[in-house]
Amino acid sequence: MTTSTTTTTNIMLQVSNVTNHTLNSTEIYQLFEYTRFGVWLMCIVGTFLNMLVITTILYYRRKKKSPSDTYICNLAVADLLIVVGLPFFLEYAKHHPKLSREVVCSGLNACFYICLFAGVCFLINLSMDRYCVIVWGVELNRVRNNKRATCWVVIFWILAALMGMPHYLMYSHTNNECVGEFANETSGWFPVFLNTKVNICGYLAPIVLMAYTYNRMVRFIINYVGKWHMQTLHVLLVVVVSFASFWFPFNLALFLESIRLLSGTQNETLQTVITFCLYVGQFLAYVRACLNPGIYILVGTQMRKDMWTTLRVFACCCVKQEIPYQDIDIELQKDIQRRAKHTKRTHYDRKHAPMESGEEEFLL
């Protein structure tokens, strides 16, 4: 009985060590005290960029919105939840110290893992949608529509909430640590299962699927199409590379932690590496959520134009512009001329366009 009790105690200590370094609310709160200005600055920048993406899609692209736009919009929503969630949860912890740590523990884990799995689903569907447009073209236009994309989005959010449920329902704040509460029968293998699930479903599987679709699209464009779709591939390549790079330290730490749990060793050097990788990985995940819209701005030409147009429209709404009475006729004539030129240009582009009308997506 003594040996069994000692073994169970050792297993629970190992589980506590794992969960202590997975979004440890106490240690994150201590870091927040030193980097409070930087966290709020990144929150403001990330909120502005993600809201700009969402506004551009919902306002500027509302009439010609494509399934890709729907996935990008929800990806921005997932990033926005991560960006806004962290500083507000930590501010709540500062002003409500009695109940705050329990809320921070569950809240940060919920935002982090739900948005992680939801963002992965949206990235995969975004790559698959681009693959269908480039490789299959008009053959899948009946299947590929906004109603189906909206249904997929709802399914993905529900699936992300279910997949992330063990990460925030089974964690609680105990002895100033955010630890997992597992039964004795599952305390040995369930943390390893959670880490492996994140490694496979949240990192390896998306990279393999996105790399496969990207490879097929590149080969198809080089052999059969032309270079007008290369802008889309540039954006997708940057998105895939940034996803793999920013999430690598976090998933590496989970993988090393699973190995340490299975082997049962207590190596201080390995534990230090795991802790460092987890902190770096969580920081990079927050940075990526803030700067992910910048990828579309820097690489996507059409995205940059649409976002700039949205900014100008809202700037004109905020600043009242008055046209003198004698210039109204002149302005109307100029507007009629611009509309006529735009109609002729649109007719010419549709006639000589290298791709079917309606295939130019928000991502280009």
UniProtKB/Swiss-Prot annotation:
GO terms for biological process: calcium-mediated signaling; cell chemotaxis; immune response; positive regulation of cytosolic calcium ion concentration. Residues 58-69, 125-150, 210-234, 301-364 are intravirion. Keywords: G-protein coupled receptor, Glycoprotein, Host cell membrane, Host membrane, Membrane, Receptor, Transducer, Transmembrane, Transmembrane helix, Viral envelope protein, Virion. GO terms for molecular function: C-C chemokine binding; C-C chemokine receptor activity. Residues 1-36, 91-103, 172-188, 256-279 are virion surface. The chain crosses the membrane at residues 37-57, 70-90, 104-124, 151-171, 189-209, 235-255, 280-300. Its main location: virion. Residues 344-364 are annotated as: Disordered. Coiled coil: none annotated. It is a multi-pass membrane protein. It holds the Pfam family 7tm_1. Glycans are attached at residues 17, 20, 24. One of its GO terms (cellular component) is viral envelope. It is found in: Virion; Host cell membrane. Plays an important role in spread of HCMV via the extracellular route. As a G-protein-coupled receptor (vGPCR), may activate signaling pathways important for virion assembly or egress processes. PANTHER family: CELL ADHESION MOLECULE (PTHR10489), G-PROTEIN COUPLED RECEPTORS FAMILY 1 PROFILE DOMAIN-CONTAINING PROTEIN (PTHR10489:SF932). Heterodimerizes with US28. Belongs to the G-protein coupled receptor 1 family. This is Envelope glycoprotein US27. It comes from Human cytomegalovirus (strain Merlin) (HHV-5).
